[in-house]
Amino acid sequence: METNNIKEEQILIRITGNDRPGLTASIMEILASKNANILDIGQADIHSTLSLGILIRISEEASGQVMKELLFKATELGVQIGFSPVTDDEYENWVNQQGKNRYILTLIGRTLTAKQIEAATKIICKQGLNIDSILRLTGRMSIKHPERNMRACIEFSLRGTPTDRAAMQEELMHISADMEIDFS
């Protein structure tokens, strides 16, 4: 796509590794120096391990230099970096998905196991919903002092329209009773 005869492109940047203060600021400094527009950004930090995704729109003229500078900065910071081009059509298709219904499903239990999350996510998938994000809502769980762990809670941000909402609720109620977890 062109703006004022300047050819632009979208690039998805993926950064993973040990998190530290100032990492995002140093990445943004490079992107700002080349006038990149941020189309989307998301970050998760699990046990000091960073997963950062940034979708940028930048002039084709500046894209090579920005990727080179980001690669050097990633090496300096000790993180891994990857780049993927996103075509105009792919980007617009993604934009057009934003009008889909959104739901929040919360999973609560004394502890949460992979088996419980598997059961919930299979129902989500069966209903044709996509998980946009998963977020832990409760504090960190102690393994040395489990008596301090009152409950565990995660939130699924879902997008789409369930194929059968009543059946979905019934299935969630069934696993709630069988697996000692609650949904809201």
Summary of predicted features, one role per range:
Residues 2-184:
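A conserved regulatory-domain signal marking ACT and ACT-like small-molecule sensing domains
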